[in-house]
Design a protein with these regions (language model features):
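Bacterial N-terminal signal peptides that target proteins for export
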Residues: 1-9
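Hydrophobic helical h-region of N-terminal Sec-dependent signal peptides
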Residues: 10-14
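C-terminal motif of bacterial Sec signal peptides marking the signal peptidase cleavage site
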Residues: 17-19
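Extracellular glycan-targeting catalytic surfaces
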Residues: 24-199
Length: 202
């Protein structure tokens, strides 16, 4: 018992002595690389896809996979083994995405959005149109089924803002990859955009 007390007192003393030691010197902040001119017209040209991956990313990935270079080929094989990256994946669109302090069904949306993204990546790298069709099918299903986030269940729960944020982004990522797929009908793409702007956010 005495040893335990001595250990405790010694630990507390060490913490107190450390806390009373001289203050650490501040580091030297790195200067801006260049001065910001408030009158300068800063423009950025969006070149799709650009949310998570660029076309240059996919060109490099395709080349590395075709060369069977590591670690790219191992990563590709892991993706191809994922249950979310299979043509047989069955999405489960919900009328309402719900997140509250007791739980909710938001994971269903997250899983389906993740599957759409993985299928989209398989299409971008392999060129197999079946994966493009599967990804679009998931996106269309949610856009035509889901009417909002916590719009009737727990509408005042602040968790809905979290759901709108991360679920909205997760659906936007595969949609960004699929927007240049000619098989995604213009009218379906417009329905998806309206859903993302008006219903998948709060």
């Amino acid at each position: 018992m005495k040893n335990l007390i001595y250990t405790f007192v010694g630990s507390v003393t060490l913490v107190l002595l450390t806390g009373c030691s001289a203050e650490f010197e501040n580091g030297t902040p790195e200067p801006w690389q260049r001065e910001i001119n408030p009158n300068e017209n800063y423009e950025y040209t969006i070149k799709h896809p650009c949310l998570v991956n660029t076309e240059a990313d996919f060109e490099r990935a395709r080349r590395k996979v075709n060369e069977r270079a590591e670690p790219w080929i191992s990563g590709w094989e892991k993706l191809c083994e994922s249950r979310f990256a299979q043509l047989s994946y069955n999405a489960n669109p919900q009328e309402e995405i719900v997140r509250h302090s007791q739980g909710g069904n938001f994971n269903t949306a997250a899983f389906d959005a993740g599957a759409a993204y993985q299928l989209a990546v398989r299409w971008k790298i392999s060129g197999d149109e079946d994966y493009a069709k599967a990804a679009v099918r998931i996106l269309n299903g949610w856009a035509k089924t889901c009417k909002g986030v916590n719009y009737k269940t727990w509408p005042d729960d602040s968790h809905r803002l979290l759901a709108a944020g991360f679920i909205g982004y997760q659906f936007a990522a595969p949609a960004e990859l699929m927007r240049d797929y000619e098989g995604w009908k213009t009218e379906d793409f417009e329905v998806f955009k309206k859903w993302k702007i008006g219903r998948a956010h709060v």
